[in-house]
């Protein structure tokens, strides 16, 4: 029996595992399956919640360089400068270091007067750092803009020189000191090439030239009588930079048309023996409305002309118009609509409302403007009559509305709508260089006719005989 019992003991099933051991095996099996499922899923980015910058743009100008960073959400940022060498640091919080930021370095132009280059990198977790290498000491400003007119959230960096350039004032000082030769005019005109149809350009065209001042006297210019002084005309090409203005159906941007026509107008005014012209902008960059007026005042301008090619709700709207400032409201619904649209240029182009500018308060004050408005209506009528020989007139009289850019209390000012870029036929005309020449001829003839009947009274500081 003992041997049988021993055999039974050797052949019986193994003892069962304890309950806790069986649970551990099941848990291990489930964990293995879960790990396999996780490995099969697509990888999730480590910084999935970071803001993706959609585009970057750089707008170099004689007065300042603007860098725009556009994104679907507002970006928190920190700005400071470093010395030895001169650098500007912009830290972006919660932003991904993506292609748009890495491409920023390639958008800095060698002719930029203030920025030499830029480097982008991950400074620490959650912070992307942009380091701008500078050519001079600067006074930077950074501010944000809410979405408007097809743009998303924008972080705007304006790089101003520590000592602002003022070529117009420098010219005045040279004249007071006895220097007779005005600075040379730009040698090449900027073409009005067909712009992209999108509101936001990928890489803005860069064509930096010195800020336009009074041009050199042409060799064949006849002498002026001793008591006749120069008549200074400030020409303001509407829009520019971040603000494309109206856009035609073929993709033509107003800012390019206005600059091209203004340059042609300047050439014709400078060819007159008793006239000189200054441009508020000479390239594709943005200037706030009040600074356009301030540039004209610094030049001691006798006349301010803002050139536009606007749009209306209906594409059938057509014809040329001339506007002057109104103290009592707009003279028509269209005039009110156009004035609101032009006055919104600062919102689209981007103005730092956090900076208290004394010039802004000064130029937007409606002082005693009755006499100035009367002169504006006179010159506007003269120009409108001449333009009627080139294009159909939208209205046969000068309209009035509250255009902010016309609020210089001491300079007769008009705003010219050369045509409606929203009208396909007129858009084609506006793109035609010959039609632009005819418009410029008509405008300068209207200016000459006005000053022939209304010569400027007080001698201008800038008008000593050359």
Over which residues does each language-model region extend?
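Structured segments of extracytoplasmic/periplasmic soluble domains
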Residues: 59, 72, 78, 135-137, ...
């Amino acid at each position: 029996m003992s041997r049988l019992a021993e055999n039974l003991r050797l052949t019986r099933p193994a003892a069962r595992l304890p309950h806790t051991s069986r649970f551990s095996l099941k848990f291990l099996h489930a964990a293995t399956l879960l790990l396999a499922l996780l490995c099969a899923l697509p990888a999730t980015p480590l910084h999935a919640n970071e803001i993706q910058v959609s585009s970057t743009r750089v707008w170099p100008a004689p007065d300042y360089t603007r860098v725009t960073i556009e994104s679907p959400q507002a970006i928190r940022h920190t700005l400071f400068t470093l010395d030895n060498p001169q650098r500007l640091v912009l830290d972006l919080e919660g932003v991904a270091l993506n292609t748009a930021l890495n491409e920023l370095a390639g958008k800095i132009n060698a002719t930029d007067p203030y920025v030499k280059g830029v480097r982008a990198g991950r400074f620490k977790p959650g912070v992307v750092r942009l380091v701008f290498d500078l050519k001079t000491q600067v006074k930077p400003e950074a501010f944000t803009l809410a979405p408007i007119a097809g743009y998303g959230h924008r972080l705007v960096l304006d790089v101003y020189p520590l000592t602002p350039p003022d070529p117009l004032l420098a010219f005045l000082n040279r004249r007071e000191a006895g220097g007779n030769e005005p600075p040379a005019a730009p040698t090449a005109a900027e073409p009005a090439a067909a712009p992209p149809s999108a509101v936001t350009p990928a890489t803005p065209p860069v064509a930096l030239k010195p800020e336009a001042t009074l041009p050199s006297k042409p060799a064949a210019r006849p002498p002026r009588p001793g008591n006749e002084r120069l008549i200074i005309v400030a020409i303001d090409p509407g829009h520019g930079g971040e603000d494309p203005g109206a856009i035609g159906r073929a993709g033509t941007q107003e800012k390019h048309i206005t600059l091209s026509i203004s340059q042609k107008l300047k050439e014709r005014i400078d060819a007159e023996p008793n006239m000189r012209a200054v441009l508020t902008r000479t390239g594709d960059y943005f200037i706030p409305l009040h600074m356009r007026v301030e540039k004209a005042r610094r030049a001691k301008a006798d006349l301010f002309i803002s050139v536009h090619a606007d749009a209306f709700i209906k594409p059938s709207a057509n014809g040329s118009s001339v506007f002057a400032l109104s103290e009592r409201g707009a003279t028509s619904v269209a005039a009110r609509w156009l004035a609101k649209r032009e006055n919104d240029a600062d919102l689209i182009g981007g103005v730092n409302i956090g900076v208290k500018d004394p010039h802004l308060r000064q130029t937007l004050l409606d002082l005693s403007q009755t006499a100035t408005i009367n002169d504006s209506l006179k010159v506007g009528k003269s120009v409108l009559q001449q333009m009627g020989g080139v294009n159909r007139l939208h209205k046969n009289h000068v309209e009035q509305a509250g255009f902010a850019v016309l609020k210089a209390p001491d300079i007769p000012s008009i705003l010219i709508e050369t045509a409606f870029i929203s009208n396909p036929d007129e858009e084609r005309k506006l793109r035609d260089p010959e039609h632009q020449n005819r418009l410029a001829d008509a405008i300068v003839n209207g200016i000459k006719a006005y000053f022939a009947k209304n010569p400027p009274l007080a001698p201008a500081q800038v008008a000593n005989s050359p």
